[in-house]
């Protein structure tokens, strides 16, 4: 783990997650194993959004130039990142089309057609799509992509600012719970004015801390106020018969949550996957001794059948040495392995190996389902607690704003530095001086701080 970046790039390939050899910078391929991790992670966020009365929808990827340019601050914020389509075949287009960097403009253009009276509100929709940003900084697989393959963007419209404010809190809770379920600890900051989402009133951001001590923004919640509503004329008739503009929020996560699960939970042997997103939660490995293969294989099939409706279980019956199988599944981060040899079977025992702690222990076969139940919970908690300890060890609270102190801490301890909030230093000049990013203002242990870090 000394060279985290090397470890990270290697694991994407050796664990069969992602192939970055695609011949276009900032783009890569989700391999089947990685695709399953992505699928289970985004199934979790889908469940949570649906649970919270959001509706999934789907909007076009192509945005006509005049539509994208409609909200001044927004287009200014994205003009250096937008990809343009200029031809249909050999025919030049009369209006060039943007590949969506994000979908405020197409969605709010349609909302104008949907919103007439206050009872048409609230609207709470989301889509999980690819989006495109011509990132000029260092691109990194699943971290800084030019084609963001898994861009979950939610957009809401409300009839009062109080309701929009409440929706921001709801979104923050959804993300907090989601990142918790992924075992990824985060620090929440309100981004500074100079680094908020283009066109937003304010931006709340979730940052996690990678093993190399750099932070990464893995989710954002924006209160858009009425900026976009005024630009897109999202006007509605109020209950009193008057007129008002809608109050909006939007919030997004991306492939970065996949990168975080890999980065925060992995170790020298490879991935350690939270059971919720593991493509295979349990691997059954029959130990085939000469002349006794049948016993182990039959028992393995029996156990497979007894588990397959409850867990994502795989029977590894490849004709290779057990040790090779053990290494493969430790590399791929399968949470639980069940080994069974003829002697175990005679004694009605099974050997369990848990990837998160590396422990190996015997259990009674009749007790398997109960054991697995408690084991899955224990693994989830252990993975989460380990990550929490690592992230906590990367947080330093200073009781002063001394620039050298801050720089010293960032270069030695790394991670996040919290200094007492003071509006006089909450400036871009200060950010220049410390040669790091001001993440924003952060509540920590009930106090208000300015959070500072080197970021991805
Ligand atoms: N180039 C990128 N590669 C991967 N993820 C990215 C990239 N750019 C942004 N993200 C992720 O996408 C999230 C949402 O992007 S954003 O610009 O902050 N917010 C929006 O686009 C709003 N429309 C809410 S979806 C960010 O918090 C970040 O985690």
From Swiss-Prot:
<dbReference type="InterPro" id="IPR002314">
    <property type="entry name" value="aa-tRNA-synt_IIb"/>
</dbReference>
<keyword id="KW-0547">Nucleotide-binding</keyword>
<dbReference type="InterPro" id="IPR004499">
    <property type="entry name" value="Pro-tRNA-ligase_IIa_arc-type"/>
</dbReference>
<dbReference type="GO" id="GO:0005737">
    <property type="term" value="C:cytoplasm"/>
</dbReference>
<keyword id="KW-0963">Cytoplasm</keyword>
<dbReference type="Pfam" id="PF03129">
    <property type="entry name" value="HGTP_anticodon"/>
</dbReference>
<dbReference type="GO" id="GO:0017101">
    <property type="term" value="C:aminoacyl-tRNA synthetase multienzyme complex"/>
</dbReference>
<comment type="similarity">
    <text>Belongs to the class-II aminoacyl-tRNA synthetase family. ProS type 3 subfamily.</text>
</comment>
<dbReference type="Pfam" id="PF09181">
    <property type="entry name" value="ProRS-C_2"/>
</dbReference>
<keyword id="KW-0648">Protein biosynthesis</keyword>
<dbReference type="InterPro" id="IPR006195">
    <property type="entry name" value="aa-tRNA-synth_II"/>
</dbReference>
<dbReference type="InterPro" id="IPR036621">
    <property type="entry name" value="Anticodon-bd_dom_sf"/>
</dbReference>
<comment type="subunit">
    <text>Homodimer.</text>
</comment>
<dbReference type="InterPro" id="IPR017449">
    <property type="entry name" value="Pro-tRNA_synth_II"/>
</dbReference>
<keyword id="KW-0436">Ligase</keyword>
<comment type="function">
    <text>Catalyzes the attachment of proline to tRNA(Pro) in a two-step reaction: proline is first activated by ATP to form Pro-AMP and then transferred to the acceptor end of tRNA(Pro).</text>
</comment>
<dbReference type="InterPro" id="IPR045864">
    <property type="entry name" value="aa-tRNA-synth_II/BPL/LPL"/>
</dbReference>
<dbReference type="InterPro" id="IPR002316">
    <property type="entry name" value="Pro-tRNA-ligase_IIa"/>
</dbReference>
<dbReference type="Pfam" id="PF00587">
    <property type="entry name" value="tRNA-synt_2b"/>
</dbReference>
<keyword id="KW-0067">ATP-binding</keyword>
<dbReference type="InterPro" id="IPR004154">
    <property type="entry name" value="Anticodon-bd"/>
</dbReference>
<keyword id="KW-0030">Aminoacyl-tRNA synthetase</keyword>
<dbReference type="InterPro" id="IPR033721">
    <property type="entry name" value="ProRS_core_arch_euk"/>
</dbReference>
<dbReference type="GO" id="GO:0005524">
    <property type="term" value="F:ATP binding"/>
</dbReference>
<protein>
    <recommendedName>
        <fullName>Proline--tRNA ligase</fullName>
        <ecNumber>6.1.1.15</ecNumber>
    </recommendedName>
</protein>
<dbReference type="GO" id="GO:0004827">
    <property type="term" value="F:proline-tRNA ligase activity"/>
</dbReference>
<dbReference type="InterPro" id="IPR015264">
    <property type="entry name" value="Pro-tRNA_synth_II_arc"/>
</dbReference>
<dbReference type="GO" id="GO:0006433">
    <property type="term" value="P:prolyl-tRNA aminoacylation"/>
</dbReference>
């Amino acid at each position: 783990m000394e060279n985290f970046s090397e470890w990270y790039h290697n694991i994407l390939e050796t664990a069969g997650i992602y192939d970055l050899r695609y011949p276009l910078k900032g783009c890569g391929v989700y391999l089947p194993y990685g695709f399953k991790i992505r699928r289970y992670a985004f199934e979790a966020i889908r469940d949570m959004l649906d649970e919270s009365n959001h509706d999934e929808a789907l909007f076009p990827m192509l945005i006509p130039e005049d539509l994208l340019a409609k909200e001044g601050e927004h287009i200014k914020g994205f003009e250096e990142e937008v990809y343009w389509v200029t031809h249909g075949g050999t025919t030049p287009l009369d209006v060039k089309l943007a590949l969506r960097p994000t979908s405020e403009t197409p969605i709010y253009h349609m909302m104008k057609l949907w919103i007439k009276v206050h009872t048409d509100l609230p609207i709470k929709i989301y889509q999980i799509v690819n989006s495109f940003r011509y990132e000029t900084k260092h691109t990194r697989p699943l971290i800084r992509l030019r084609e963001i393959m898994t861009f979950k963007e939610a957009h809401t419209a409300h009839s009062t600012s109080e309701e929009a404010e409440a929706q921001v809190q709801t979104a923050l809770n959804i993300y907090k719970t989601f990142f918790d379920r992924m075992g990824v600890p985060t620090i929440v900051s309100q981004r500074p004015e100079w680094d908020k989402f283009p066109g937003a009133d304010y931006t709340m951001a979730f940052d996690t801390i990678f093993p190399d001590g750099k932070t990464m923004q893995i989710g954002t919640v924006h209160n858009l106020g009425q900026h976009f509503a005024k630009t897109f004329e999202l006007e509605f008739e109020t209950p009193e018969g008057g007129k008002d503009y809608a109050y909006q929020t939007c919030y997004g996560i991306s492939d970065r949550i996949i990168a975080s699960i890999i980065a925060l939970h992995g170790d020298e042997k490879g991935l350690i996957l939270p059971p919720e997103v593991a493509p295979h939660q349990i691997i059954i490995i029959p130990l085939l001794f000469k002349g006794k293969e049948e016993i182990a294989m039959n028992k393995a099939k029996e156990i497979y059948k007894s588990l397959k409706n409850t867990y994502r279980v795989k029977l590894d019956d490849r004709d290779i040495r057990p040790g090779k199988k053990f290494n493969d599944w430790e590399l791929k981060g399968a949470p639980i392995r069940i080994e069974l040899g003829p002697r175990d079977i005679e004694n009605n025992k099974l050997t369990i190996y848990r990837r998160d702690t590396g422990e190996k222990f015997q259990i009674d076969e009749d007790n398997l389902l109960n054991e697995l139940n408690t084991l899955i919970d224990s693994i989830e908690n252990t993975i989460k607690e380990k990550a929490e300890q690592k992230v906590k060890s990367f947080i330093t609270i200073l009781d002063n704003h001394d620039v050298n102190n801050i720089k010293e801490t960032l270069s030695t301890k790394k991670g996040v530095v919290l200094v007492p909030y003071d509006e006089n230093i909450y400036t871009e000049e200060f950010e220049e001086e410390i040669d790091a990013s001001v993440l924003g203002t952060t509540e920590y242990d009930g106090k208000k701080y300015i959070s500072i870090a080197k970021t991805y």
